[in-house]
Amino acid sequence: MPKYYCDYCDKYLTHDSPSVRKSHTVGKQHKLAVQLFYQQFEAEFTQSLIEARLKEYEESKGRLIHQPPMGIIPTPYGQMYQQQQQQQQQQGILPFQGMQPPPHQQQGMVLSPGMPIHKMQPHQFNNNNNPHQQHSFQPPHHQHHPHQQHQQHQQHQHQHQHQQQHNQPTIPGL
């Protein structure tokens, strides 16, 4: 009679029958061996993924030097401005206080062709420091604050209950 070999436990069973295999697979040693096998498999698989990612990173490290982020294409205007700034700094020329960088240019950020240029204005704040001053913005009339809606609903229910109490027919003798 052929013997059954358990790959997880690395041993042969006495003989190959369903009852022997079943009693072996429900045993404590077999369950522990199966758990250990899958833990090792998971660890090896995770390590191989980590090594593959590191290899990809090391290979791409030399290719990605000084590339702008996706969607931002360097333009000649931005490059000329940066070169001009570098030359002025090297010559010791300080830019005039009123000089500003081109619109939307912040620390190497360059607009791609076709991007709209908007001059952003600083937010205007009210300087009179009156905390009780009403703001000019009012929400549309059809929108109500949730608390107001709750109050209106309660008032409606109260009116409805009041009407029901007064509209009940009176029974003589009660």
UniProtKB/Swiss-Prot annotation:
Pfam family, one: zf-U1
Compartment(s) where it occurs, according to its Swiss-Prot or TrEMBL record: Nucleus
GO BP annotation list: mRNA 5'-splice site recognition; spliceosomal snRNP assembly
Coiled-coil residue spans: none
Keyword hit for Zinc: yes
Predominant location category: nucleus
Region listing for Disordered, in residue ranges: 82-174
SUPFAM superfamilies referenced in this protein's UniProt entry, alphabetically: beta-beta-alpha zinc fingers
One Gene Ontology term, aspect cellular component: U1 snRNP
Quaternary context: Component of the U1 snRNP. The U1 snRNP is composed of the U1 snRNA and the 7 core Sm proteins SNRPB, SNRPD1, SNRPD2, SNRPD3, SNRPE, SNRPF and SNRPG that assemble in a heptameric protein ring on the Sm site of the small nuclear RNA to form the core snRNP, and at least 3 U1 snRNP-specific proteins SNRNP70/U1-70K, SNRPA/U1-A and SNRPC/U1-C. SNRPC/U1-C interacts with U1 snRNA and the 5' splice-site region of the pre-mRNA.
HAMAP family linked: U1_C
Function recorded in the entry: Component of the spliceosomal U1 snRNP, which is essential for recognition of the pre-mRNA 5' splice-site and the subsequent assembly of the spliceosome. SNRPC/U1-C is directly involved in initial 5' splice-site recognition for both constitutive and regulated alternative splicing. The interaction with the 5' splice-site seems to precede base-pairing between the pre-mRNA and the U1 snRNA. Stimulates commitment or early (E) complex formation by stabilizing the base pairing of the 5' end of the U1 snRNA and the 5' splice-site region.
Protein name, as recorded: U1 small nuclear ribonucleoprotein C
Encoding gene, per UniProt annotation: snrpC
